[in-house]
Amino acid sequence: MDEMATTQISKDELDELKEAFAKVDLNSNGFICDYELHELFKEANMPLPGYKVREIIQKLMLDGDRNKDGKISFDEFVYIFQEVKSSDIAKTFRKAINRKEGICALGGTSELSSEGTQHSYSEEEKYAFVNWINKALENDPDCRHVIPMNPNTDDLFKAVGDGIVLCKMINLSVPDTIDERAINKKKLTPFIIQENLNLALNSASAIGCHVVNIGAEDLRAGKPHLVLGLLWQIIKIGLFADIELSRNEALAALLRDGETLEELMKLSPEELLLRWANFHLENSGWQKINNFSADIKDSKAYFHLLNQIAPKGQKEGEPRIDINMSGFNETDDLKRAESMLQQADKLGCRQFVTPADVVSGNPKLNLAFVANLFNKYPALTKPENQDIDWTLLEGETREERTFRNWMNSLGVNPHVNHLYADLQDALVILQLYERIKVPVDWSKVNKPPYPKLGANMKKLENCNYAVELGKHPAKFSLVGIGGQDLNDGNQTLTLALVWQLMRRYTLNVLEDLGDGQKANDDIIVSWVNRTLNEAGKSTSIQSFKDKTISSSLAVVDLIDAIQPGCINYDLVKSGTLTEDDKHNNAKYAVSMARRIGARVYALPEDLVEVKPKMVMTVFACLMGRGMKRV
């Protein structure tokens, strides 16, 4: 950090800036590039036209990026705040950062954390999440010690401290992610709590949460902004799970004239929700909305939406629910919002927003409110007579989902909702190269928003660059793979590249732990067998294709060898195993691996079916954890 910047800045201010930098630096690579700035302005929900935002970003990059490497380092970020403070551009930038949900108040007032730095957090989010979690876990005997929480106090930040609530919420969002037998529920010593928090964090990572900046100690301390950030990711994954065509074919009712199913499938859950709300608003004769913030502040669109989706009592066993529209004409916005929420309550959907959240247009909480409405009352009918190719709706394979969750857990941006469609401009792939220490020259990369004309050309250039990096600096085997294949969304060839990225990422972790010694399959297999042997275990593996792996006994034994005594062998079946036995062993093995601190992305089925690629990642993660033994 150069002297000039440091002399004018206090330690508290510096910590604050670090906090802000981390929030803008979505992929946590230590630099901010222009697409991250675009995201910041998008999330801050500022009433600026697109061209204005582009202008501001260009100016920030021009003034801030002093060494002209196409990205802003932390030093340059500090410089923007110190030197460019007075300019309108910097003021707008600071406003965007302060408005971004859950960000520290730069030069504002907020709760002081233990280190004396400022972290603000959204009281509205806390209130909303507490009510949602209270409802979700009200009948769970394992949570009686903390549920119900008081939404008006700091109960939430204490309640997540032992990891149980987090594990339960993860399972509600993606059922069966965590084997309940692996959650420590009794005699909660600090060590046992640490294990639960490991289990929660590594499982959150496996379902696609970005947890790079969150440690178990942050959760134990109940750091508000980190707790809320993690909970929002977990809750959102659950809310969005069914807003996806392959899991909900009735969404095809939202097809527009001349639109193909393939085009509809490329929409993100947020875009589909907006399309869904507008479908019902159109049927009610009300005007379209463009967002879940400014356009819903007067609650009028919500009144019409509720009236459209409320059950009309026409199906068998379905009671009719009438929405009272009289509050629509209320003159006061807050009273109108309250009246609307009372109607939502009739549908059992008074969740996530208070009248004030509606009137202020809180984008995050309104999105959650609408997603919950969709999940309870989609009010869509699958189109029967149209010429639709339903075979497209196969849904993603396990392998595709694992790759997607791995990418999202690393904080790539934009978020990957659809593996092939969302990689077609290669931006995500280029960010993954950075994660595996392959330098990317961002000045060569075309970034959104792409021009209307020639957009695909810009994306194709990125794809060509991604393949070029794979062949040369990364030394991947990419025979027969060209940029066009990524741009076309060719599944086999895209997967081939993505697997090599994930494999390299996994091996890099091992090499970092092993003082730079190269790691490969043979080294991992021999380490596994040596470790099992030294611990007096009778299991061993020949390779990652070894059929005996399907019992998961070698994995379970290895976990017990790494952390002696952690496996409860009463829960492990051996001898002649049924498919159910194998599945239960695998489920326990994956959760226990995560509990002792291995970030395993694979699924129990990968072990049962002995999928060599995923099996390799499991053993590599365990080897990494084993090498960390102090």
UniProtKB/Swiss-Prot annotation:
Residues 383-627 are annotated as: Actin-binding 2. The modification Phosphothreonine is found at T391. Keywords: Actin-binding, Calcium, Cytoplasm, Metal-binding, Phosphoprotein, Repeat. Ca(2+) 2 binds at D65, N67, D69, K71, E76. The keyword Plastid does not apply. The modification Phosphoserine is found at S268, S293, S326, S339. It is found in: Cytoplasm. GO terms for molecular function: actin filament binding; calcium ion binding. Actin-bundling protein. This is Plastin-3. The gene is PLS3.
